[in-house]
Structures are given as C-alpha cells and as structure tokens.
Amino acid sequence: MYTFVAMPFRKTHFLALLTILFAFKGSAQRAFVHTSGPELVDGANHPLMLRGTNLGNWLEPEGYMFHFDGGPQSPREIEDLTTELIGPDKAAEFWQQWRRSYITAGDIDRIKKQGFNSVRVPIHWRLFDSDDAEGFHLLDQLVQWARKDGIYVIIDLHCAPGGQTGTNIDDSNGYPWLFSSQEAQAHTIAIWRRIAGHYKNEPIVLGYDLLNEPIPHYPQLQQFNKDLEPFYRRLAESIRQIDRNHVLILGGAQWDSNFKVFGPPFDSNAMYTFHKYWTAPDASVIREYLEFRDRYHVPIWLGESGENKDEWVAAFTRTLEDNHVGWCFWPYKKMDAKSSPVTFDRPAHWDDIVKFAALKPGTGNAEKRIAARPPAEDIQAAFDDLLNQIRFDREHVNAGYVKALGLTPDAPQ
C-alpha cells in the first residue's frame, strides 16, 4: 500500500519547473529552421545558406518540358491531350505511374550527393484536397527520403484554387480568379490549413511558399497588386492558428519580382522570395531585394532561376553567393535538355506526339485531329517509353550545369 504524503511546494520549485518547461519549449522550437533578423538559421541557430533545386514537372506538368511548343501548356491541357490519345483509363494509370516514378529516393540521394541542401516542391491543389489525398502520400514519402539525406523541403503552392497567375503555370482558366473569388480564397486557405496541420511537427519541412508567381506583368491584371499582401495576411493568420513552427515564404507580384506590394513584415518568421530569369547575372538585378532585406531586417531567397547557359548560371550563382542570398534553380530534371542537373532522353515516337499536340485544339477541330492521329501502337509506345525514360536509372547528369552552380558534379550515369 502506498501512502501519499503532501510536501510543501515552494516558490523556488515552481520557478525551476517553469525554467525547465520553457527550456524544453525553446529547444523544440529551435529544432525547426527559422528566421533570425536577415538570416535563415537551422535548428541549432547556425546560419543556413539554401542551395536548392525545384522538383518541377512532377506534380504540376508544364508543356514546355514536354517540348509542346505551341501545344498544351497547363496541367489540365496536357492531361486532356493524354486522355485524347490513350483514353481515360490508361491516362489515369499513366499519371499515377508518372507521379510514382518522376522523383524517387534515388533522386533525393543524388541531389544530396551533388551538394544541394534543399528542394522546392511545386504542388497542385487538386492533389491535396482531402486528408487522404494522393499528394500527401507522395509528399510524405519525399519527406521521409529527405529526412534521411538531410535535405530541407519547401512546399510551394504552384497551382492555387481559382488561379493566382492566370496563365499555364497555375492551371487556371486564363485569369487569376483567386483575387476576386471568395470561394477560391476560402478554398486556398483550407488547402494551406490542411497542409500545415499535416506537417506542423516535421522539422525537415522548412517552410511554405504560399503562392507561386502571383499576378503577371500584364497591365490589365495589376489592379490585383493591392490585394496580394492582404491575402497573404489572411493565409498567415489562418496557418498560424495551427502551425507556428514553419517559415512562411512570401513572393512578390509580377512573377514574384515586385516587392513594392509589401509593407513592413507582419509575421516574425517570414522570408521573402523573388524569381529571376533572362536578366543580367550581376548584382544590379537583385539590388532592390537586398535593399528590402536591409530595410526590414528579413531574409530573402531566390526561389526560381535558370533556364540558361552554364556560363550565365555560374555568374548569377556567384552573385547570389557573394551577397548571401540562398537560391533554388529551376528545374531539377527535364527531357532532352542541358539546363538542369539531370535530363532524360526523348521517348520513341515522341516527335509524332509533339506534332499532333501542336494542332488546333477543341472538338470543333475533331475531324482534322482524328485524321492526323499517329498510329495507335505508336502512341502507346511513346507514352510507355516516356515512363521508361523518366526512371532514375535512365537519367543522365548534366555535369557542366551542376559545376556551374558551384557544386561537385555527380559521377556520370
């Protein structure tokens, strides 16, 4: 029999207990990457310089990476073409296999060996529209691989409900309805709350890139610039009700380039991101972002760049490194290309698919399209070989590109 004996609980004991609890809480918070003034720091409070690659075309296919010049460009357009060519049942099976094969554990191992320390994962809202959605299964697997290799994961909402850009990249209807549709805004908030709830305790997930490249440079759409930061505030407030651990990443208007839409920072754990393509590779193109960092004492990050020659990539990377700006080049992997860390061969009969894809679309042109279809066996062979070519063991390393990033090239495959 146990006898409970009441003991006096002194004030000093209470204070000691509080000290232990707060120390534990602080230790838990420090396990996550977070901001510290103009720097990003890791869980041990050491400065963290991000050197990353974008896993583009995995969960949000883009037409140019299939060489569909003049053809389908958005995910839905590419999926419609696939369905038209191989039918709905085979198309559904194809895309499931695509998502299982395009990025694998071998790829994350290679990314680690090449010297990267982070990946940005562009996602489509449709894959995260329920707690048991396919996207969570795929991303959970990626997080597991990344945790093993010490690769930080940044989740990027590339395709938001309603569309934040109004072009192919957000899979919209050709207009950024997100900024004028209350339903789309509520849906986007719900997507981020679901993601935050799922990953709130996962330290290898570095942060959430809330909207990719909102509002293009088209003059007619710049009316929405004034709505961007208020919507970011709504997203942040909603996410912070669930997850106070992760960095919130905010991109400017006009393809993430215009920081004039921002006032003083409204979240104590936020980083600001910009994208730069086809510019001079010197410090003049990032000066306004450096000034923003100095003015508000917040970290900045290049979330996308690339699609250029090795010489340009090398020069721009040096500029970023010299100015202590973390970076993430686009993309990791492309078909028949030199402007990515790895590439894969063009599938058999793919030129026939590209030629067909360039025809004028729509059921009003069905007769002409049906007449121009490649032979059924060639179509099937092309899509089968595409799944074969994207496999990890069929990829080729672009050593010159990896070297241009200042990283150690992987062994040739």
List each language-model region with its residue ranges.
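Aromatic-rich peripheral "rim/lid" segments of glycoside hydrolase catalytic domains that contact
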Residues: 312-413
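Short amphipathic alpha-helical segments that mediate assembly, nucleic-acid/protein binding
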Residues: 11-14, 78-79, 91, 379-383, ...
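A general structural signal for short secondary-structure junctions and capping/turn motifs
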Residues: 4, 9-10, 42-44, 292, ...
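Active-site mouth of glycoside hydrolases
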Residues: 35-50, 54-247, 252-260
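Extracellular glycoside hydrolase catalytic/binding regions
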Residues: 32-33, 89, 186-335, 339-355
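Bacterial Sec-dependent N-terminal signal peptides
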Residues: 1-29
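Alpha-helical transmembrane segments and their juxtamembrane interfaces
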Residues: 21-23, 166, 219, 314
